[in-house]
């Protein structure tokens, strides 16, 4: 029986490259001259530091642009509330990896509501979809791509 897996992963190497490129852009931008601002990658989290809230917003936009250039989906970003310590502002940006249980249940419900002849099962942090016809699986992929669940999904391990 044909099957595929639905996963939600980000490429950590591309994330590191995007953060490095964003830091490089900060050093060349005129509006960030003589400003203590930086991106710091800690595991799969990015710590953004700047001297003001407005600069934090600009830095998030810079990071989004570099993520898009490196083909990392910005929907995986989860920006925490900014914190003020003295004159510096800090913000942690978390990147979601894996599919949590409520999102997996929404995926399974979405697949069942589409009335396609496929079965979906939750297997840890991924969802396995099996069906008799390859066309049904491709219709399932199209339905999931149309749905906005606030998280990027990849489809891998497609088997006939």
From Swiss-Prot:
UniProt GO MF annotations: nucleotide binding
Function of the molecule: Nucleotide-binding protein.
UniProt cross-references to InterPro entries, sorted A to Z: DUF520, UPF0234-like_C, UPF0234_N, YajQ-like_sf
Protein name according to UniProt: Nucleotide-binding protein VP1617
Cellular component GO terms, alphabetical: cytosol
Similarity comment: family membership: Belongs to the YajQ family.
The entry's keywords: Nucleotide-binding
């Amino acid at each position: 029986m044909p099957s595929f897996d639905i996963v939600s992963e980000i490429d950590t190497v591309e994330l590191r490259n995007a953060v490095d490129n964003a830091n490089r852009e900060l050093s060349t931008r005129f509006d960030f001259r003589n400003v203590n601002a930086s991106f710091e990658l800690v595991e799969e989290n990015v710590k953004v530091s700047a001297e003001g809230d407005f600069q934090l917003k600009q830095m998030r936009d810079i990071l989004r642009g570099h993520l898009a250039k490196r083909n990392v989906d910005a929907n995986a970003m989860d920006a925490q509330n900014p914190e003020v310590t003295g004159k510096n502002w800090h913000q942690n940006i978390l990147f979601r990896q894996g599919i949590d249980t409520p999102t997996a249940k929404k995926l399974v419900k979405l697949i069942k509501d589409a009335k396609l002849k496929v079965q979906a099962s939750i297997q840890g942090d991924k969802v396995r979809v099996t069906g008799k016809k390859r066309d049904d699986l491709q219709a399932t992929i199209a339905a999931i791509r149309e749905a906005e669940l606030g998280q990027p999904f990849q489809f891998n391990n497609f088997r006939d």
